[in-house]
Every structure is written in C-alpha cells, then in structure tokens.
Regions:
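N-terminal acidic leader/helix
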Residues: 1-25
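Helix-turn-helix DNA-binding elements, focusing on the entry/boundary residues of the two helices
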Residues: 28
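Short alpha-helical "recognition helix" segments of helix-turn-helix
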Residues: 31-32
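Short acidic, Pro/Gly- and aromatic-enriched capping/linker segments at domain boundaries
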Residues: 37-50
Length: 61
C-alpha cells in the first residue's frame, strides 16, 4: 500500500484498523509518519465523520 484512502473516510477507518489489528503498525502516529500525513490532519479527517482514534483500544471508532 503506497497511500491511505484519505478521501473515503469509512475506508480510511477500515484501513487504519486493519493495519493496527494485524500489528503492521503499533499506533496511529506510526501510520501517519509512514504515509506522510500530519497527525492533526488525520484527527480532523476522522472527526469530520464522527470517528476518533482511541489509544486505549488502539483502534478508530
């Protein structure tokens, strides 16, 4: 995968949770770094559709 589906938020959530669940990345910060997306921008995109990264569960809900 060479980019995240930033324009399709439900697909973005699914992709992030897949990458975290399969332990490809340890947390959202690592995903943002790898795909060159600012964490603040990622949080804004997720929040625009009512989603947020939950560190306690290491997933987006």
């Amino acid at each position: 995968m060479d980019h995240l589906p930033l324009s399709d938020i439900p697909m973005l959530v699914s992709t992030i949770n897949f990458l975290l669940r399969d332990e490809i990345f340890d947390n959202l910060d690592q995903i943002c770094y790898c795909f060159n997306v600012e964490r603040e921008e990622m949080d804004r995109l997720l929040a625009s559709q009512g989603y947020a990264y939950q560190e306690k569960f290491n997933s987006v809900k």
